[in-house]
Amino acid sequence: IFDECLKYGIKPLVTLSHYETPVGLVNKWGSWSDSRTIDCFLRYVKSVGERYKDKVEYWLTFNEINCIDFSGWVAAGIPNQNPQTIADAAKNQLIASAKSVITLHNINPNNKVGNMIGYGIKYPNTCHPNDILKTWEEANEDYFYCDVQARGYYPRYKLKEYERNGVVFSLNDKEKEILKSGTV
């Protein structure tokens, strides 16, 4: 397919993960809620990146990464919507995304790696400040993933949300550096 696209001047764009978490990883480790899944994903990324390094230079790491918040099974192979599990899985996918960016740039410095979210435009019901704030908070649920992938750090509003909801969250120095170095 790539050869045919290139023959007609079409540059392929590859999405590395599009809702297909292997059931073996779900059964063995609980999928993306376990950080060991990152290494499995990176072996896959390296394999695909090496194989198609002369044919593909446009990549997306995860399709609609933010969908993990409301559809954990589809987006990350998580059979529940427990906030702690979702936060852990999101962290692992975001670290995997950053490591994928680094890996793909090491394979071919010309690679361009991006991200995408599933997003529907949001409007406040009225111009009342409470409606506007609610709309902003809902938008941040989606923007959070872009913020981390593009800026390389967890935004304060998400850390405060975790704190309010009793989610235990931390990043060690190595993880912080990975997020910072692996921006899209």
Predicted regions and their residues:
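Active-site region of glycoside hydrolase catalytic domains
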Residues: F2-V184
